[in-house]
Amino acid sequence: MVEVALKGVTKRWGSFVGVRSIDLVIRDREFIVFLGPSGCGKTTTMRMIAGLEDPTEGDILIGGKVVNDLEPKDRDVAMVFQNYGLYPNLTVYENIRFPLKVRRVDTASHDARVRKAASMVELGDLLARRPKELSGGQRQRVALARAIVREPAVFLMDEPLSNLDAKLRVSTRAQIKNLQ
C-alpha cells in the first residue's frame, strides 16, 4: 500500500458541487472509511482516486505522484463496487484471474494467486461456477477476490459488505483488515 493524498479536490457538474475542496492524507497501510448519507460524495471521491471521474479542481497523489492525468489502468488502484461487476460468461476462477490477464502478469503465477485470493474470501470450492450460480454474498466475494489478486498499491471498496449475510460480514471484515 502507498500514501494517497487529496489536495483541494473538488468535483462539480455545472452549478452542482458534489465534492467540495477535500484535503485528506491516507497514510501507507492506513484503513479509513467514508461515512455519510447518500449523495454526499463518498463514491465520487473514490471514483476520482481511481481515475473514473476527473476532479474539477485540486490534485490527487498516489505514492507521492500526481495522478490526475493518469488513466485508471495506470494508477495501480483496485476498486470493489457494491454491484459486483462480474463477467457472467466466465467462471469464478476466470473472473478472479481476469485482472492478471489484462495486465499481462506472468501466467506461471496465475493459478497460485487466484487460489490464494479465492481462499482468503472462502471461495475455494466455487471456482468452477459461473456468477448466476452464486448467491449475492458469493458474488461480492468474487469481486473482492478479483481486487485482491491484483496486489494493488491502493484498495478502494464501495460498500463491499452490503450484500453479505451477518456471518460473512464478520469474517470478510477480518479479511479486509488483513489486506493492510
Question: Which sequence ranges carry the predicted segments?
Answer:
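ABC family nucleotide-binding domain
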Residues: 1-172, 178-179
